[in-house]
Amino acid sequence: MEATNQTGGCTALAALYFQGKLYVANAGDSRAILVLKDSIVPMSSEFTPESERQRIQHLAFLFPKLLDGEFTRFEFPRRLKGDDVGHKVLYRDYFMEGWGYKTVEKADLKYPLVHGHGKQARLLGTLAVSRGLGDHQLKVIDTNIEVKPFLSCIPKVNVFDFALHDIKEDDVLIMATDGLWDVLCNDEVAHVVRSFLAENRTDPQRFSELAKCLVCRARGKKRGHQWMLDESHEASYDDISVFVIPLHNREED
């Protein structure tokens, strides 16, 4: 992207079938699962500032100048205030799985390198993902701090060996952006998949129609100025892209 003078960035999720095995590579927060007749097989892991906290903090430990004196690499359960200086609070650093205690110093009052939890977790207060492609020019707003050094483009690859499984006609690979997974869990998606395919067995376009069905489920229905799943739950506000790939007769393509 830098070579073609393009700006911006994206996550990446790719699948390859080769010599009887399925390889799924993921860098970002998209997700892939296999929906089989009697089971669900996760084929990816999401990479967020929260899930990669230790890697990100370790980079800040090795190269403190990347923070430009504006951020602290330490994680705290809450934002610290001036009254906390001199008191012991819980914290985590790159070498810690759990929490420990430290005496708060003035430098600890800076904004955390990784802040928030779940979908609200942010890297440098900017990005919700920690792996992906691009974002070479991205900087923290109103600063010269570059985000790119903390991002990794290296994917995690999961492998599924078809020789170890009896693949059925309705077994599929679901690949989707976080717009789907923000509002539907693996079990809910699998329920939609199995029900839809069972009810549309003779439709030659059923896999494409299933992808549309999943998008519509996550988008919900418009109620006033909002899109809602039901009366009390908001629908996905993110982009929703879904691929449904049948696993049966895979040697034909």
PLM regions: where:
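PP2C/PPM-type serine/threonine phosphatase catalytic core
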Residues: 1-253
